[in-house]
Structures are given as C-alpha cells and as structure tokens.
C-alpha cells in the first residue's frame, strides 16, 4: 500500500474526484496509465477535476498524501475500482523500479491531463468567454447543462477528445458518454441535436462540399468547422471565437450536392480513396442516346475517376469514348461536340438519334469541303459512318447484340469516309462513297451494286440482316478489310445491328461482305452503271465534277424497311440513286409527297423508296423511255441535290418524314440540303446559303410565309396569278411527281439535256435549273432570261402530249423531255413551295442568274 500511497496517494487522487469518482462510476474502464481514471469524472467530480487540471504536474504528489486513504474511500465508493487500484499499485510496488515507474506513469498522465487542460482552457476562453453570439448562445441558454458545471466543463473538454486519436488515454466510457461533443465546441451533447447531426455528417461517408479540404482539427472542433474558410456573414453566431483559432471565420457552405462530388479529377487520381466516400455519379453518363457505354443504361455507370482517362474536358465523356478506344479518330470533335436535341438526355427515345447519329464531325472533316460549321446539324446520315451512341439499341435494331457493341466500335477509316462524303460536290453524287477512294475517282458503283448496306438491301425491300450478309465475326472476315465503311451510307441497321457490335463494331473490315475488293458491289440494287445511280451515267458528270454543291443527281435511297427499323428513324443511307432514277422507278409519285416539290427538290428518297418498294428489284418501269437513262430526270450535270433522306411526305409508311436536320421541322415548301447532303427545310437551307451559318433555332417559326413573286407571275406568259394558283392547286397534289417526271424527262438523258438547252434558248426554261456543264447551262440561263412559263394549265396540256412519261396522268409531270422548258413553268406551279419559297430554286421564278446561283447552291 505504500506503493499505493506513494504513487497511490498521488493516485489516491482516486478520491480526487477526477480520477476516482470516475473510478467509482466508470472504474470498469481501466487503463494501465490511469488515463482511464482521469477522463471519467462525470460523476460530479468536476471540482476535483478542475483542481487536478489546475495543478501543475501533480499536486497529488504534494497533497495527495492527505488523500492517501483514498483507496479505502475508493473501496467504499467503488469496491471494484479499489480492487483494481490495489492490484495495480501492488503490482507496481513489486516491480524493480516501482517508484520510477509509478512516477513515470503519473507524469505521463499528468502531461496528458495538462495538455488537455490547456486546450480546454484555450477553447473555453475562445468559445465561452467571448460569449458566443447567436446560435451558440441560444444553444447554451437552451441547454441547461444537466450535469451542472461539471458536465459542461467535461463536455467542453470533450472536444479535446480529438486527442483520442492522439492521446489514447480516454476511457471507452467517455467515448460512449460524449461521442458527439468530441468534435464540436463546448455544449452539452444531449441538448444539441444539431451537433449530433453535424457530427454524423462529419463522420459520415457522404462528404460535404468542402470535402476537398482535409478536415483540420481546429475546424473539426468548431461547430461549423467543416465549412470552407470563408467569412461567416450571418448576423448570428459570427464566430468571433474563431479568432483565437487559426481558422478564419467562414461562411456556411451550400448543401453539398449528393451527386456531384466536390473532388476534382486530379484529386481522385492522386487520392483514389477519396472517391470511395463519394457517390458514384459523374457527368459521364451518356445521355440515353449514348447510354450504350457499358451497360446500356443511363444510370451512374462509371466511377467518376474514369473521367480522367477521357480526353474530353470536364469529364463530360458523353460519348463513352474513354472506353471506346477505336473512336479516337473522332477525338478532336469530342471537345466541341454539341448537345443537339437528338442527343439530349431528355429525349431518350429521340427518333432521330439513329437517323442523325451523333458522330463527331470535326475530326474528320476537310474544312475546305465542309460548308457549314461541323456542329451545325446532324452529320450526314449517309456520308458519315456513324457508330451508334445510343444505349437503347432496340431503337435501331431488334437484335441488339449487347451494350458492348458501341464500345467495341472503331472507325478506322472514318476520316477518309468523311472526306469522300463531305465534299458533297466533289464526290460523285453517289451517296455511297467507297472507302477505297472509288468515290473520289468517280468510279461509283459499277455494275448492279449490291449495296445491301446491312439493313439496306435495296433490291428486296425487306431488310437484310447484316448477320446474314456479314457473318457474325468482325463482319465475316471474308469481307475485304480494306473498305471499312464501304459506303458512307451504310444503314444504321448495319452499323448498329447486333452482329455489328459483336465483332467489335466499327472495324467493319468490309461493311458489306458482298462488296469485292474493288468496291464493286455486285448484287444488290439493280442499277446499271448506266443508271443514274452510277455517277458515270450523269451526263455532266466527271469524276471530279465541279466543286459546287451538286443539287440533284443523287438521291438517298432509304431502304424503306430500314427507315423505321428500330422504331426510330434509321439513318437514310441512300445509295445515291439519282433522283431521276427514283422518278423513273416511282410508280405513282403522287402517292408520295403531298408537299409539292420543286424541280430542284425532288423527293428522291421517297420516290426511290417508292420505286424500291414497287420495282426496286426490277428495272425502273417509269422511265419515260427505257432507252433514256433513268437519271435523265435530273440532268446529271445539274447538281441536283440528293433527295431528302426522309423522303416521302405522305408516302411510304415505313419512311420517316423528312426532317430538317437543323430545326427538325417536317413542313417546308422546299427541302434543301446542307453541304453534307442532309435535309434542311427551305428556311434553314436559305439561311445557310445566304449567311453561311446555321440558322439559329430562335428564328424558327411555324408559319411559312408565302411570297408573291411578281416576277414569277409576269414571267408566266399569259398566265394570270389566279390561273397559276388554280393550276397550282391542281398540280400541287402531283407536284412531286410532276417535277419528278418532268425532270426525268428533261434531264433524263444527255440528249434531253441538249434538248432542254435548245428549248431554253427558245425561251423555255429547262426544269433542271442547274445549268449542265454542257449547253444546258447556257440554255437554262437563256431560258430563265426569257422565261415564258406556260401557265400550269398549258403546261399540263403540253404534258398530255408527252406520253413518254408513264405517270403522265393529268399531273404536269408527264411533260415530255423536250417540254422540259414547259415543265419548268411547272416548277413555279409547284407553287406553294416554289412560289412561296424564293428558295425554291425552281426556275419557276425564272429569275435569271440569281436562280442559277440558287441552283448551284441549292443543296445548301
């Protein structure tokens, strides 16, 4: 017991309420260095606690003797504690250096206590003496300290229990007793639920918005310590007591977003552990259109730290390209990719998502050949091989292989493809440009191209399952790998068909297995090289035809079944069947677009689709004369722009309506094309042509203003406005067919072109306004100059004579090729569109060179 008294007297301090009252109540918490004892003084020994803390190292050694009986007293109060104490001291007394050990123990505990005391005092002076204003005061006043000053003192010291992490001498009891206050400034725990909440928040895995700043002790100990260091400007609780701390006053932070973690990618990269506490959320998730990245869902699919691998700034890897290593060729565009309405996450099922795939444009564009800002609209559905970025693969194809199909997709030849297709006019107007450069050489499809671009098995309208055509490997390895996208216009079905993803997607060694190395597709569409489909058939065409936008000769044939294949508009991968061919093939163009199309804007896609449906497999039946190249409808020299992808207005139910790629309208008197061949409404097309920039959607209106062209009315010799209108009414229904047939007739063959030119000289406007490179241009110009547009009725009459056109029906379309000039009046008659739209580049207006210019630029 000497040991007890000796060290024990110091220790006898157990009576010293601080340690041993604790011992009484909490003595069950024991630690070798008595640290157990000291901390639990909740019993009421706050006074003793104060004395102990107030004394320098151990006053107990000085006056501890007076309390030397404490073991007895302790036994009275807490027999168990006394037993432990005796056992401990007795053991110490038997140690060789008992005095020194005991002294050392006490000193260590004293140092801990002293430090604790100093910290307590400092904090108390800072937090309590300044009489914290506002919330702090209200809390203190609201909370009558239940345990009295002792508890208050204890709790104030509790924040010191930060030292639990530094000085592990606290007893478990204390931890349990004041677990929360430990992290906050002095106030009784129980009465401050907010503290518990904050403590929970501090300890909680969900980090506050200030998370990037590692919590510091001072800040942790203060009520709003977790807040970023800012001046706290609230009237209450101005945190004056922070002055003593090195923590500057700070403003309370906004609620941390549970979804957007505050950590930067750099932090994540360096401290991967930080991400564990953060919700797995990132802006990476591709909008549903792209959601294909890994699981085909738009949910949080990748840990945010995957951003860092993406070369897209801000971690906005909307394309999921970080996983899509094959798409690096499109990388440059990723940074200026645009959130177009079709991409919008809000329109998950956007029907255009497939029609206008969001393939990055800029990377592969030849800026010189790209006539509008790359992000201006959807990429040409035909001209660009587009990986699907959609998670809802079912949209495009029923047999979506797996969400992996997107990630595996690679676009090796993407740039070359884009080059060939983007230079709209340079390329043969063939929408399918062979990746092996055939398109550049103008060696368009020779022989009956079997452009069964996966879904686009033209001859049989039914969809050819690419898996049948391509096999299930990387598109049947037998297919020559030389041509990646043999044609820009491979249908979405091909790109997106299940087997497409299976093989790793974009690396279609040869999208069309049937394509032989030469790119000669030899089995699908029954187009002769002589057909308008083959560019060579175009009279004015040479492999490098003029660099202005070709307006008319090619049309995209959307395999009708393919169009809506996934239930959404598939890309219209038109094989650029010339519009004339389409016209030749269309059985009853009237049944197709009700919107009258001007001669310059043949609804070729619809017509071709129609013809494909009806007579795709067979030779075109509607050629005015089989001998004349079907293409004649558009003098190939006339840069007729490809038909609207959406083609038929009211026609083929399978064909989605033509939609403006800029404003997404489906109603326009005249369909135009952007440099890439994508359909633009008249307004957007004109705007682009005139201003060189994409028409802002803010200008979009639902009202189509019709302009009375006095010039057109005057030009129409002997035709009164009313007569025009009446004829217009009559012809409007058939307008598409009319323009088509007339065009077919007029440009049906180079001879017809010649005829048209001569006619033009006679003052009749050839319908194909674009002057062929040969005489027709001059003829056209002359014709325009002397545009004597016969009234529609006259036109019709003239048409009637021309029996060559099978569709002659009363519609003007049956104008004979020579009557091309007469047909031209028809174009104005196409009235609603033509007259309404100056943009109607129909020579209907007959406005001289300006119209020629319009013709040249019409595809815009």
Swiss-Prot record:
Heme among keywords: no
UniProt biased composition (Basic residues): 1-14
Biased composition (Polar residues): 122-144, 577-587, 710-719, 732-746
Zn-finger segments (GATA-type): 660-684
A molecular function (GO) term: DNA-binding transcription factor activity, RNA polymerase II-specific
One of the GO BP terms on file: positive regulation of transcription by RNA polymerase II
Compartments, as annotated in UniProt: Nucleus
Pfam families: AreA_N, GATA, GATA_AreA
Entry keywords, A to Z: Activator, DNA-binding, Metal-binding, Nitrate assimilation, Nucleus, Transcription, Transcription regulation, Zinc, Zinc-finger
One GO location term (cellular component): nucleus
Extent of Basic and acidic residues compositional bias: 174-184
Keyword Transcription regulation: yes
Stored SMART domains: ZnF_GATA (SM00401)
Low complexity composition bias: residue spans: 747-758, 766-791, 813-840
InterPro entries: AreA_GATA, AreA_N, Transcription_factor_GATA, Znf_GATA, Znf_NHR/GATA
Region feature Disordered, mapped onto this chain: 1-24, 116-159, 174-193, 559-600, 612-658, 706-850
Function: Major nitrogen regulatory protein.
Record protein name field: Nitrogen regulatory protein areA
Species of origin: Penicillium roqueforti
Gene designation per UniProt: AREA
């Amino acid at each position: 017991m000497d040991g007890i008294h000796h060290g024990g007297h110091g220790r006898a301090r157990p009576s010293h309420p601080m340690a041993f009252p604790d011992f009484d109540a909490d003595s069950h918490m024991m630690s070798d260095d008595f640290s157990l004892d000291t901390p639990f003084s909740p019993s009421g020994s706050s006074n003793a606690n104060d004395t102990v803390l107030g004394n320098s190292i151990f006053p107990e050694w000085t006056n501890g003797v007076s309390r030397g009986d404490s073991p007895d007293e302790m036994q009275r109060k807490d027999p168990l504690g006394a037993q432990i104490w005796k056992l401990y001291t007795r053991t110490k007394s038997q140690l060789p250096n008992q005095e020194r050990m005991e002294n050392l123990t006490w000193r260590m505990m004293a140092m801990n206590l002293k430090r604790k005391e100093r910290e307590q005092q400092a904090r108390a002076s800072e937090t309590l003496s300044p009489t914290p204003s506002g919330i702090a005061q209200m809390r203190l006043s609201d909370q009558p300290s239940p345990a009295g000053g002792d508890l208050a003192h204890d709790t104030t010291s509790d924040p010191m229990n930060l030292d639990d992490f530094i000085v592990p001498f606290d007893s478990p009891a204390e931890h349990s007793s004041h677990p929360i206050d430990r992290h906050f400034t002095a106030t009784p725990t129980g009465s401050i639920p907010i503290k518990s909440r904050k403590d929970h928040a501090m300890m909680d895995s969900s980090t506050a918005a200030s998370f990037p700043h590692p919590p510091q002790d001072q800040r942790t100990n203060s009520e709003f310590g977790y807040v970023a260091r800012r001046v706290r400007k609230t009237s209450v609780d101005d945190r004056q007591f922070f002055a003593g701390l090195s923590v500057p006053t700070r403003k309370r932070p906004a609620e941390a977003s549970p979804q957007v973690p505050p950590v930067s990618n750099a932090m994540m990269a360096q401290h991967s552990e930080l991400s564990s506490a953060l919700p797995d959320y990132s802006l990476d998730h591709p909008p549903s259109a792209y959601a294909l990245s890994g699981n085909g869902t738009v949910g949080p699919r990748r840990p945010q730290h995957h951003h860092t691998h993406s070369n897209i700034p801000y971690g906005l890897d909307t394309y999921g390209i970080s996983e899509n290593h094959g798409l690096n060729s499109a990388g440059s565009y990723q940074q200026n990719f645009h959130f177009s309405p079709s991409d919008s996450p809000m329109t998950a099922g956007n029907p255009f998502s497939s029609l206008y795939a969001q393939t990055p444009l800029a990377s592969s564009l030849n800026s010189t050949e790209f006539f509008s800002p790359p992000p201006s609209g959807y990429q040409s559905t035909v001209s660009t091989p587009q990986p699907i970025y959609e998670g809802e693969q079912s949209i495009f194809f029923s047999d979506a292989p797996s969400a992996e199909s997107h990630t595996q997709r690679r676009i090796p030849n993407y740039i070359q493809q884009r080059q060939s297709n983007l230079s709209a006019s340079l390329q043969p107007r063939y929408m399918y440009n062979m990746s092996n450069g055939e398109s550049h050489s103008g060696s368009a499809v020779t022989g009956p191209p079997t452009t069964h671009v996966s879904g686009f098995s033209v001859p049989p309208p039914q969809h050819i399952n690419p898996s049948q055509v391509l096999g299930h490997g990387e598109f049947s390895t037998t297919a020559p790998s030389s041509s990646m996208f043999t044609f820009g216009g491979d249908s979405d079905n091909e790109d997106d068909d299940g087997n497409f993803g299976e093989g790793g997607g974009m690396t279609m060694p040869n999208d069309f297995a049937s394509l032989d190395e030469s790119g000669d597709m030899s089995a699908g569409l029954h187009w002769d090289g002589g057909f308008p489909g083959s560019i060579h058939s175009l009279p004015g065409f040479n492999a490098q035809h003029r660099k202005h936008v070709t307006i008319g000769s090619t049309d995209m044939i959307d395999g009708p079944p393919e169009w809506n294949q996934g239930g959404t508009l598939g890309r219209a991968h038109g094989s650029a069947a010339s519009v004339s061919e389409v016209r030749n093939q269309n059985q009853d163009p009237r049944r197709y677009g009700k919107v009258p199309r001007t001669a310059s804007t043949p609804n070729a896609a619809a017509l071709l689709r129609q013809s494909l449906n009806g007579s795709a497999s067979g030779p075109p039946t509607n050629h005015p004369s089989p001998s004349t190249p079907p293409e004649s409808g558009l003098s190939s020299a006339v840069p007729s722009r490809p038909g609207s992808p959406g083609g038929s207005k009211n026609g083929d139910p399978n064909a989605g309506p033509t939609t403006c790629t800029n404003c997404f309208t489906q109603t326009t008197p005249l369909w135009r094309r952007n440099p890439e061949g994508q359909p633009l409404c008249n307004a957007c097309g004109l705007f682009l042509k005139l201003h060189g920039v994409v028409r802002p959607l803010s200008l979009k209106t639902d009202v189509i203003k019709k302009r009375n062209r006095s010039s057109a009315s005057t030009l129409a010799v002997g035709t009164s406005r009313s007569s025009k209108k009446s004829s217009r009414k009559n012809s409007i229904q058939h307008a598409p067919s009319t323009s088509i047939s007339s065009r077919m007739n007029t440009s049906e063959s180079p001879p017809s072109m010649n005829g048209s030119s001569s006619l033009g000289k006679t003052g009749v406007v050839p319908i194909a306004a674009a002057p062929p490179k040969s005489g027709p241009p001059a003829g056209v110009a002359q014709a325009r100059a002397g545009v004597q547009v016969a009234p529609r009725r006259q036109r019709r009459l003239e048409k009637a004579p021309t029996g060559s056109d099978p569709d002659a029906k009363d519609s003007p379309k049956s104008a004979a090729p020579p009557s091309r000039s007469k047909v031209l009046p028809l174009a104005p008659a196409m009235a609603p569109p033509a007259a309404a739209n100056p943009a109607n580049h129909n020579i209907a207006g007959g406005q001289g060179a300006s119209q020629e210019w319009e013709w040249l630029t019409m595809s815009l």
